[in-house]
């Protein structure tokens, strides 16, 4: 195996290279650290991220399917990690820290239970694999980052606790109006941004309660998970995209990037110098079975060792970048940062526009309902993606 593709399975944890002694700032999901004076803080922050890896001996997918995702599920696990980070930000906050060996907050337990390897967990490997069948992917088949993004968008609809608005940007374009329609569906944008739908909604026959809820909703914003599938080059990443990509990790709304190299997928959470920092799903651990109260040993869901690093030029150009906006102000701030980055050196990775060009308007924009044909358009754009990644056998 090439040294550049060493994984946690092929290295003893004690042999993983520590962070370099460098004056270059370390950026992890919108936070800046010093490798010279804050190494413990860096490792604590990395350890607090959810780490989803291959698992074995879980319930058969679909009742008769695989009981392990080793060799084919790495991109699915990366999708779990980027969404897991969104749920952490949603329910616990970006500054939350994991404390090993201690009883955790109920919100944390609920988040982990959403990813447990069983069929009735919102974002389990079972749900992702079976939902992928609707995207034309058979169970056990490789997923590209755009397919994972589309599947996560579908699954989030059923997560009433988190109440996320998951948006997958199409055609390398982020449309501000489209996102605000999604995150504030109770506003009538056709009559003006401040207009509220006048249709009464019954809640168990209680119109007064419905009105109270409507008043509450007008002050709310459905927390946004924005996933942007991108292609930053042909066979290799275009160096003009390197600085804009780094800037994404510096934004407080950053959820990181899923992607990798031609033979494996990784979850990228930051960078130092010209090296990307990532969590690697390529180690196989036994499936965890929660107790009746929902609690279970959680050590295996946190990487308690220095994360992996790779030179940014080794990144496969097909990626999906993620961002989380808890409030409308967060989203407006993100838009301002993106416009600033677009005016700096390098090529913008995607376009940010106020409204959707008429020739690109889709039923999803008009109806505000999940349009499962979105992935078809993305697959045509990324039609070579799945062939470029190879299944990694360990």
From Swiss-Prot:
Name the residues that span the membrane: none
The reaction(s) catalysed by this protein are:
[protein]-C-terminal L-amino acid-glycyl-phosphatidylethanolamide + H2O = [protein]-C-terminal L-amino acid-glycine + a 1,2-diacyl-sn-glycero-3-phosphoethanolamine; [protein]-C-terminal L-amino acid-glycyl-phosphatidylserine + H2O = [protein]-C-terminal L-amino acid-glycine + a 1,2-diacyl-sn-glycero-3-phospho-L-serine
Q: Where in the cell is it found?
A: Cytoplasm; Cytoplasm, Cytosol; Cytoplasmic vesicle, Autophagosome; Endoplasmic reticulum
A GO molecular-function term, please? cysteine-type endopeptidase activity
Chain ranges for the short sequence motif LIR as given in the UniProt record: 389-392
The record's GO CC annotations read:
autophagosome; cytoplasm; cytoplasmic vesicle; cytosol; endoplasmic reticulum; mitochondrion
Q: What class of enzyme is it?
A: hydrolase
- Superkingdom, natural source: Eukaryota
EC nos? 3.4.22.-
Keywords attached to this entry = Autophagy, Cytoplasm, Cytoplasmic vesicle, Endoplasmic reticulum, Hydrolase, Mitochondrion, Protease, Protein transport, Thiol protease, Transport, Ubl conjugation pathway
Q: Which GO terms describe its biological process?
A: aggrephagy; autophagosome assembly; autophagy; microautophagy; mitophagy; otolith mineralization completed early in development; piecemeal microautophagy of the nucleus; protein processing
Briefly, what is this protein's role?
Answer: Cysteine protease that plays a key role in autophagy by mediating both proteolytic activation and delipidation of ATG8 family proteins. Required for canonical autophagy (macroautophagy), non-canonical autophagy as well as for mitophagy. The protease activity is required for proteolytic activation of ATG8 family proteins: cleaves the C-terminal amino acid of ATG8 proteins to reveal a C-terminal glycine. Exposure of the glycine at the C-terminus is essential for ATG8 proteins conjugation to phosphatidylethanolamine (PE) and insertion to membranes, which is necessary for autophagy.
**Notes on the domains:** The LIR motif (LC3-interacting region) is required for the interaction with ATG8 family proteins. Required for proteolytic activation and delipidation of ATG8 proteins.
Query: Member of which family?
Result: Belongs to the peptidase C54 family.
Return the protein name: Cysteine protease ATG4B
Provide the species name: Danio rerio
């Amino acid at each position: 195996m090439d040294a550049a593709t060493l994984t946690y399975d092929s290295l003893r944890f004690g042999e993983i290279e520590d962070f370099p002694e460098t004056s270059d700032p370390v950026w992890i999901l919108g936070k800046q650290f010093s490798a010279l004076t804050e190494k413990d803080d860096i490792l604590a922050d990395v350890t607090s991220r959810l780490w989803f890896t291959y698992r074995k001996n879980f319930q058969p997918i679909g009742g008769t399917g695989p009981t392990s995702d080793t060799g084919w599920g790495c991109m699915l696990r990366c999708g779990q990690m980027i969404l897991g980070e969104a749920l952490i930000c949603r329910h616990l906050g970006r500054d939350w820290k994991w404390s090993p060996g201690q009883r955790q907050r109920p919100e944390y337990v609920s988040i982990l239970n959403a990813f447990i390897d069983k069929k009735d967990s919102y974002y389990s490997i079972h749900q992702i694999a079976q939902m992928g069948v609707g995207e034309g992917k058979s169970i056990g088949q490789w997923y590209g980052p755009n397919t994972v993004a589309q599947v996560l968008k579908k699954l989030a609809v059923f997560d009433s606790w988190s109440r996320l608005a998951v948006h997958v940007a199409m055609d390398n374009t982020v449309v501000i109006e489209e996102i605000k329609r999604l995150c504030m569906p109770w506003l009538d944008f056709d009559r003006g941004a401040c207009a509220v739908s006048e249709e009464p909604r019954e809640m168990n026959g209680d119109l007064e309660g419905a009105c109270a809820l409507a008043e509450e909703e007008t002050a709310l914003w459905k927390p946004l998970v924005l996933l942007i599938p991108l292609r930053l080059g042909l066979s290799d990443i275009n160096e003009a995209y390197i600085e804009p990509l780094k800037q994404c990790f510096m934004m407080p709304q950053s959820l990181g990037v899923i992607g990798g190299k031609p033979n494996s997928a990784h979850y990228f959470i930051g960078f130092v110098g010209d090296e990307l920092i990532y969590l690697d799903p390529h180690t196989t651990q036994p499936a965890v079975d929660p107790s009746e109260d929902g609690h279970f040993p959680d050590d295996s869901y946190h990487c308690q060792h220095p994360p992996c690093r790779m030179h940014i030029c080794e990144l496969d150009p097909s990626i999906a970048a993620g961002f989380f906006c808890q409030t409308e102000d967060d989203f407006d701030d993100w838009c301002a940062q993106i416009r600033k980055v677009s005016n700096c050196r390098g090529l913008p990775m995607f376009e940010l526009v106020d409204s959707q060009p008429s020739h690109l308007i889709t039923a999803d924009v008009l109806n505000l309902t999940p349009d499962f044909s979105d992935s078809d358009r993305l697959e045509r754009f990324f039609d070579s993606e799945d062939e470029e990644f190879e299944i990694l056998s360990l």
